[in-house]
């Protein structure tokens, strides 16, 4: 029984089958397969932006220092597919049950930071990146002496890596294979038509969107009792 998750080469070859193109042994074999990798990277970003996927969930921890408000989330020690953070879902600290509340306004955080309040951290903000590209978070209030040495835990969704033709042929794509194949078929049809939304493309795109929405709905204990609405998607979960 084969895995529902496919390698880059398996995805491209299945698309070749559907497009009546000869299968390849490497994605650098012809211009169609090379371009398919570029389109695949577009689909990876689109899927990551559509919602929270279980396959992309990861976490990291930092040690808090008394009086320090900014911390780098070091993800470079993780595997390649998890080096880059797409979005942060939750920040919590040991010794506190509820998660920290996000601060959306950077001006507000800068004002709070000037207060130099020290105590139990209760709020956080994403504050740019450090010199090596790791994202930084700022917490308020600054950790007090009783929190020095405690851990702050960051739950985040990783950003899928950019695939390179030939080099990444054996890499397993982190999204369900059927969804990715249908999305790449639609993208290839649109590209072949020069951007014209033909009936063939519209039919392929409808299949892809239905598969994508259904797969994303299953990520959140789909029971059929509730309707989940987000931009571009209305699905029962």
Regions found by a protein language model. Name each.
Residues 1-237:
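Glycine-enriched, solvent-exposed interface loops adjoining structured elements
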